[in-house]
């Protein structure tokens, strides 16, 4: 089944506007292309406006894990993220394998 790479970023209020613009115009398109993900989406958590979430979809768990676990693609994107934001933004990454999917 499919899998997702989920990246959460804790963004300070004073960085939110610049981060949002950068992620929209540079980082999400670059990551989507580098990862060759099926789709890439992002948003802000409604009840925690400092929490940004990006979701990259893959056809299977092995593909998502290969990207997330130290691939050259993610290593390069992490380096660019760190260059732009230094240590101001803490982030976490999880790979989630879909075990059940219902559709309407």
Positions of PLM-derived features:
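Macromolecular interaction modules
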Residues: 1-104
